[in-house]
Curated annotation (Swiss-Prot):
Substrates-to-products reaction catalysed: N(2)-formyl-N(1)-(5-phospho-beta-D-ribosyl)glycinamide + L-glutamine + ATP + H2O = 2-formamido-N(1)-(5-O-phospho-beta-D-ribosyl)acetamidine + L-glutamate + ADP + phosphate + H(+); L-glutamine + H2O = L-glutamate + NH4(+)
GO cellular component, one term: cytoplasm
Keyword Transit peptide appears in the UniProt entry: no
One Pfam family this sequence matches: GATase_5
Function: Part of the phosphoribosylformylglycinamidine synthase complex involved in the purines biosynthetic pathway. Catalyzes the ATP-dependent conversion of formylglycinamide ribonucleotide (FGAR) and glutamine to yield formylglycinamidine ribonucleotide (FGAM) and glutamate. The FGAM synthase complex is composed of three subunits. PurQ produces an ammonia molecule by converting glutamine to glutamate. PurL transfers the ammonia molecule to FGAR to form FGAM in an ATP-dependent manner.
Keyword Nucleotide-binding: yes
Name of the protein this chain belongs to: Phosphoribosylformylglycinamidine synthase subunit PurQ
Keywords: ATP-binding, Cytoplasm, Glutamine amidotransferase, Hydrolase, Ligase, Nucleotide-binding, Purine biosynthesis
SUPFAM superfamilies given in the database record: Class I glutamine amidotransferase-like
Length: 226
């Protein structure tokens, strides 16, 4: 597969995302800057963490208007994989590609540690390499990761199997311990934890690697190469 790593002003996890898919998995990857207007030739889109546009107004609220985001929306509408991690999740929510909102952490503090996640749905293109209800360890690093949605949206997320990951112990106040969700079609995933920081034993664990291998295995079945 060929991945586009989207780079906004203030992104700081783009190098990690690139390393995960290019160096660890051996897939093709290129940086695509926020000013671009085409994703031609790419099979997957990765929106990394960081502080896009300085997180002014709200996290991700300015990045949603970047020229590349119109193409990301079209890409998602075609059913192709879009992954947003941390600030990338915030951008996807602000852009309307995922429901809900991400607010300040419950304790109003930036949190940086490794947490236990539970795989709630292993039947998505992002989670097929995990076991259902498996516990994995993945780092978090955020100040605004407190996921919230109204009751109707929460009921829909549950009914449609859109809750991909939950926290075993809630670090930030997220409703129902939610750590990551997909869109209804299942091809857009947003999550606050950083799987790209858990792809090598040298970094303390490889539990995040299987998220990327899940995408690649989906690509092997669905992507047609010329």
């Amino acid at each position: 597969m060929k991945f586009a790593v989207i780079v906004f002003p203030g992104s700081n996890c783009d190098l990690d995302m690139y390393h995960a898919v290019k160096d660890v998995l051996g897939e093709e990857a290129e940086y695509v800057f926020h000013t671009e207007t085409s994703l031609e030739g790419f099979d997957g889109v990765l929106l990394p963490g960081g502080f896009s546009y300085g997180d002014y107004l709200r996290c991700g609220s300015i990045a949603q208007f970047s020229p590349i985001m119109a193409e990301v929306k079209r890409f998602a509408e075609e059913g192709r994989p879009v992954l947003g991690v941390c600030n990338g999740f915030q951008v996807l929510v602000e852009a309307g590609l995922l429901p809900g909102v991400l607010m300040r952490n419950r304790d109003l503090k930036f949190m940086c540690k490794t947490v236990d996640l539970v795989v709630e749905n292993n039947e998505t293109m992002f989670t097929s390499e995990y076991a259902a209800q498996e516990t994995i360890r993945v780092p978090i690093a955020h100040g605004e990761g407190n996921y919230y949605c109204d009751d109707a949206t929460l009921a829909a997320l549950k009914a449609n199997g859109q809750i991909a990951f939950t926290y075993k112990e809630n670090p930030n106040g997220s409703v129902e311990n939610i750590a990551g969700i997909t869109n209804e079609a299942g091809n857009v995933l947003g999550m606050m934890p950083h799987p790209e920081r858990a792809v090598e034993a040298l970094l303390g664990g490889e539990d995040g690697k299987r998220l990327f291998t899940s995408i690649v295995k989906w690509g092997a079945r669905h992507v047609t190469y010329n």
